[in-house]
């Protein structure tokens, strides 16, 4: 993203995100084409930048952004088969985390020549906390568990991050776990 801010003529946050996603997608695809053991690799992503009272968000795949204000709210929508099943009414939202197809994503960086990220903006307030995380966290903990951990550690985000990872690992920790917490 920082590279794109320097070189792009698209100076809006959304324009910068779109260019950064395109560049990352091209780089991953090139690496996969040059190194046989990387063939077919891809990744998910979520990123945000805040200007004044607006958070600009981009996501691809099932990495998520949450906002903790009065309560914890999922902001991004997963690009996954189970999310599509929820939207069509085939399963309930509370069944996503344990569904056998929970790891099938419908969009990722590096898997297709072009990628369509979701780019949007949300209003934020001073004191809000943003949680950016991978599915290694959200597949192991319910949103209510994450909210409880954030409330218990509201004055120590570093400890909150450690506790989120520890609890996800204790719950089975089947995937890598990435957590970023930012207080506005």
Identify what each model region corresponds to.
Residues 1-184:
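PP2C/PPM-type serine/threonine phosphatase catalytic domain
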């Amino acid at each position: 993203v920082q590279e794109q801010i320097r070189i792009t003529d698209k100076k809006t946050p959304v324009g910068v995100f779109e260019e950064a996603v395109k560049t990352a997608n091209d780089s991953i695809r090139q690496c996969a084409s040059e190194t046989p053991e990387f063939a077919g690799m891809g990744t998910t992503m979520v990123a945000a930048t805040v200007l004044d009272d607006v958070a600009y968000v981009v996501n691809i795949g099932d990495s998520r952004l949450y906002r903790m204000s009065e309560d914890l709210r999922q902001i991004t929508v997963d690009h996954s088969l189970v999310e599509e099943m929820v939207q069509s009414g085939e399963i309930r939202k509370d069944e996503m985390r344990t569904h056998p197809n929970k790891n099938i994503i419908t969009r990722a960086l590096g898997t297709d020549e072009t990628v369509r990220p979701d780019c949007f903006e949300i209003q934020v307030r001073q004191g809000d906390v943003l949680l950016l995380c991978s599915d290694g966290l959200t597949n192991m903990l319910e949103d209510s568990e994450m909210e409880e951990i954030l409330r218990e550690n509201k004055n120590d985000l570093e400890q909150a991050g450690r506790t989120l990872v520890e609890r996800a690992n204790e719950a089975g920790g089947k995937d890598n776990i990435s957590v970023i917490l930012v207080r506005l």
